[in-house]
UniProtKB/Swiss-Prot annotation:
Catalysed reactions listed for this entry: (2R)-3-phosphoglycerate + ATP = (2R)-3-phospho-glyceroyl phosphate + ADP
Gene: pgk
Protein name as it appears in the record: Phosphoglycerate kinase
Family annotation (Pfam families): PGK
GO biological process, one term: glycolytic process
Length: 392
């Protein structure tokens, strides 16, 4: 890799600053999902095993920067980590003036966003954070697209900066899927808006043989094919863009299977009755909330031929059971595939959990925004600074 990884660095008797992604749901002072905490354990354990001292940093939620707010405190997260790793985890509420930690110990610092200058990565704050440790480990891929003090600035000023085990695994999986994929390659891009995924769609066109669109994005493509989408969520101002993408795909020999049938309802409701219709039969007062059985079959058949699958976003309103069939069929097709599969994004992970296919997906990314920016082909600031440090 073009940057140092944790295993390239001497950690014995070093104070190791680790930027983790512990932005987890907390309710009544208890962590309700520990997935992101568990994902950081290999990095933490490796540092301890190598004789280092661990200083953990993370954000939680969106507090007003520079102000303490107990509802965004990481104290419950420190307790949850202690239970998972079966070791004491000290909690440092005020930590910028120094952290008392010895080899073999773990300290969790309070929310980085309580510090003024975090989001703008001010030199003053970045230098203060860097002065706390000997080595900086970036292990929060979910925040790698942000040039903030705890993800980017600290790496500029600390003597050694490297990637943690989780970050290294994320980059390797994504590069395997995007930079050296085993062909044919299929990508699934779902979700409500074309506008947020337009550059992703354009970037993927040059890399894939199959591009499956779902959700509100698919509705915009259905409209681009000249069909009425009734009361469905779609973006009128991006119909021309969708038409261009379809034309470009045709020229490149990329298959975009725009839905041929859909499940519609008269209202956006969990209890709404799902009616299966051809796309040509959707009327003005109906909204498309899922793909239909014919479209499911087409997608499942296409995915059988793929050797690499990249998945970001559902193909319907899978949170409502009446409109979950399309995303369920997609999930099962990916689960049954022999392909190397990478999935990412909050809704995608929720679908994976709902349909119980976690063990059948080759790699599940913990990131949302950073995952998308990687798919767009953008450079991620927190990764770029690690590359720069490796050259120096």
């Amino acid at each position: 890799m073009s940057f140092l990884t944790l295993k390239d660095v001497d950690l014995k008797d070093k104070k190791v600053l680790v930027r983790v992604d512990f932005n987890v749901p907390v309710k009544d002072g208890k962590v309700t999902s520990k997935v992101r905490i568990e994902a950081a354990i290999p990095t933490i354990q490796y540092i301890l095993d190598q004789g280092g001292a661990v200083i953990l940093m993370s954000h939680l939620g969106r507090p007003t920067e520079g102000e303490y707010d107990s509802q965004f405190s990481l104290e419950p997260v420190a307790k949850a980590l202690s239970e998972i790793i079966n070791k004491p985890v000290k909690f440092a509420k005020d930590w910028l003036d120094g952290v008392d930690v010895k080899a073999g110990e773990i300290v969790m610092c309070e929310n980085v966003r309580f510090n003024s200058g975090e989001k703008k990565s001010t030199d003053d704050l970045s230098k203060k954070i860097a002065s706390l440790g000997d080595v900086f480990v970036m292990d929060a891929f979910a925040t790698a697209h942000r040039a903030q003090a705890s993800t980017y600035g600290v790496a500029k000023y600390i003597p050694v900066a490297c990637a943690g085990i989780l970050l290294t695994n994320e980059i390797q999986a994504l590069e395997k899927a995007l930079k050296s994929p085993k062909k044919p390659m299929a990508a699934i891009v779902g979700g409500s808006k074309v506008s947020t995924k337009l550059s992703v769609l354009n970037n993927l066109l040059d890399k894939v043989e199959i591009l499956i669109v779902g959700g509100g994005i698919a509705n915009t493509f259905i409209k681009a094919e000249g069909f009425d989408v009734g009361n469905s969520l779609y973006e009128q101002d991006l119909v021309a863009e969708a038409t261009e993408i379809l034309a470009k795909a045709k020229a490149l020999g990329v298959n975009i299977p725009v839905p041929v049938d859909v499940r519609v309802a008269k209202e956006f409701s969990e209890n709404a009755q799902a009616i299966i219709k051809k796309v040509s039969d959707v009327v003005a007062d109906e909204m498309i909330l899922d793909i239909g059985p014919e479209s499911q079959k087409i997608i499942a058949e296409l995915l059988k031929s793929a050797n690499t699958i990249l998945w970001n976003g559902p193909v319907g309103v899978f949170e409502f059971d009446n409109f979950a069939e399309g995303t369920k069929a997609l999930s099962l097709a990916i689960a049954q595939s022999h392909a190397f599969s990478v999935a990412g994004g909050g809704d995608t992970i929720a679908a994976i959990e709902k349909f119980g296919i976690k063990d059948q997906v080759s790699y599940i990314s913990t990131a949302g925004g950073a995952f998308l920016e990687f798919l767009e082909g953008k450079k991620l600031p927190a990764i770029e600074i690690l590359k720069e440090k490796a050259i120096r």
